[in-house]
Amino acid sequence: MTKSIHENGTAASVYQGSIAEYWNQEANPVNLELGEVDGYFHHHYGIGEPDWSVVEGDAATSHERTTRELHRLETWQAEFLLDHLGGVEPEHRIMDAGCGRGGSSFMAHERFGCSVEGVSLSRKQVDFANAQARERGVADKVAFHQLNMLDTGFDTASMRAIWNNESTMYVDLHDLFAEHSRLLARGGRYVTITGCYNDVYGLPSRAVSTINAHYICDIHPRSGYFRAMAANRLVPCAVVDLTEATVPYWRLRAKSPLATGIEETFIEAYTSGSFQYLLIAADRV
């Protein structure tokens, strides 16, 4: 795997510095305890119908059962994203933009056998994920870098596929898709799963604004994704509305001891129609 890029821990802006600081300090049990279930640490939400029996029965085991069920739904979400990456072969190279602690990157390598580059602003996340790669014996194929996803330094047309899993709300979409378009080989695939506010609703609702403040992010309008893709040679080939599929996850998480307090805000945002959870896949032309 090429190691020639320069890793720079200096954020490109004050805002990026605040994001790096946030994730360097983050040690939320809803991320860590779920990852300890099977060693795949995710930083995204889940989809699918839960097994509601986990919140019933023996209170002594309910916490563990609920944790496992939340993790199952988050892993299912990652699998659904990977299903849309297209024809990735072992000789290809792909990138996880906003990789967190690396869960989806390891899943991608196991599925495709290819090289995976993970990118995060957080030194803590990168160090954690690289330690995981060494423990798994795949450090020669899966590597994590403290880099700005808007300016990675990777070679032009070096990637077969790139994905953002709930990380686009931290960047300008035109800048992001310009860099992704540069990195993707012609015919390569880009996939994102993201929350976005519904243009039909108007401006961001109070619930969406609360989510922005909670995560120090800037949720984009749905239309913004398609405008920025069109401007950067990314042609959508699939759009899947996952809003209804993610609401049960949030209802289960709200009942969990791992709830962080933001759950009811997400439920309100989704059920009011002001917020949507989408998968968008696009081809580089």
Curated annotation (Swiss-Prot):
Domain of life from the UniProt record: Bacteria
Molecular-function GO terms, alphabetical: C-methyltransferase activity; magnesium ion binding; S-adenosyl-L-methionine binding; S-adenosylmethionine-dependent methyltransferase activity
EC number: 2.1.1.255
Record keywords, A-Z: Magnesium, Methyltransferase, S-adenosyl-L-methionine, Transferase
GO biological process: methylation; terpene metabolic process
EC class: transferase
Catalytic activity as recorded in UniProt: (2E)-geranyl diphosphate + S-adenosyl-L-methionine = (E)-2-methylgeranyl diphosphate + S-adenosyl-L-homocysteine + H(+)
Database matches in Pfam families: Methyltransf_25
CDD domains on file: AdoMet_MTases
Gene3D superfamilies reported in the protein's UniProt record: Vaccinia Virus protein VP39
The protein's required cofactors: Mg(2+)
Described purpose of this protein according to its UniProt entry: Catalyzes the SAM-dependent methylation of geranyl diphosphate (GPP) to yield (E)-2-methylgeranyl diphosphate (2-MeGPP).
Family the entry assigns: Belongs to the geranyl diphosphate 2-C-methyltransferase family.
Name of protein: Geranyl diphosphate 2-C-methyltransferase
